[in-house]
Amino acid sequence: MKGRRALEALNFFVADVQAGIGPFLGVFLQARGWGADQIGTVMTIGGIAGMLATSPAGALVDATRHKRSLVVIAGLMTMLASGLLWISHGYWMVAASQVATAITGAAIGPALAGMTLGMVRQHGFDRQFGRNQVANHGGNVVAAALSGWLGWRYGFGAVFVLSALFGLLSIVAVSSIPADAIDHDVARGADAKATAGEPAAAGAPASGLRVLLQSRPLLLLAAALGLFHLGNAAMLPLYGLAIVAAHQGEPSAFTAQTIVIAQLVMVAAAMLATRLIRWRGYWWVILLTFLALPVRGLIAASVIHAWGVWPVQALDGIGAGLQSVAVPALVVRLLEGSGRVNVGQGVVMTVQAAGAALSPALGGILAHRFGYPAAFIALGAVSTGSLVLWLSFGATLRHACAADGGAARNAVEAASPAS
């Protein structure tokens, strides 16, 4: 029980570590004379670096028995990268900071998922990961609210200090998790039938990486999420830039407001996600997230005003909150028994990161040339590709996403060649 509470505390504090000053980066650079296109491209550079690092990071999490140390190193590197950003505002120094933040952040997601699976096993993963995400979104709310107030009261420097403080607290939290609380074979999904009282077979062999390519539902999930994030990732920073450019809000305070609203909704969505999955299954829950984004784009284009942040970010919170629980849990179920669960998490995150990396450049260029409303409409239109894909392969995906997971697991096992 102590280990689980420490795990939830880690998820709370690591929320601000994963992205560094991420959401505040746009207004921070805008205040120093950067244009929307420059901001978009430098964020894309970081996104591409994170995309390239995510799959290797997942493989590393599967292979290592030092997952706690991996989180500590990632936290330290993120703090150093944020310090570099504060010291220098030159294009390539900022780009280097974003690359470092993205690479280290890429390791944290699979590491947290693997640690959770290793501690509570398959039968307890959905519930515990839901609790983790509630803590994570709660951490984002607190960090954003404090960052907004500190930035307004003391300037952007205080935002960097707060990020470093959260980094130190995340190190304390991960150090509080007992080393023997994590079964590293179970953590990579090597024991499909593990229960709370049955240890995994030591050194259980992992099936080949081809299982990832031969799991059609996994590839469809990744492709749909890639299209979703191509439209989604740029909306928050662009909406903040649009409001600030229209002189509708103070940069730090408004950026914090956008984050707090979304994260509060994410807390509620994450709390409901496990119940919705049990009631309707993964397919319907993920479909709901895809439906929310085009509507969000239309509202963002129509209401560039301070009060518009409420519907725009509430819809973001619904989509992100449900996905934060449903997607990792579905990947665990699809690859149960393969021994490559965290590689699978990394593959899905890589495709998501590809869409997210291209989104700021696409949105920034469109906003620079055609204005913010056109950019929001275009991003919302792009995201409908995820909806089309999810519906077109509905029969296959509904079968694989069934809440009992049996069909999906059998499909993966049938596709798994001997290593």
Descriptions of predicted regions:
Residues 35-45, 247-264, 343-346:
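Loop-to-transmembrane helix entry
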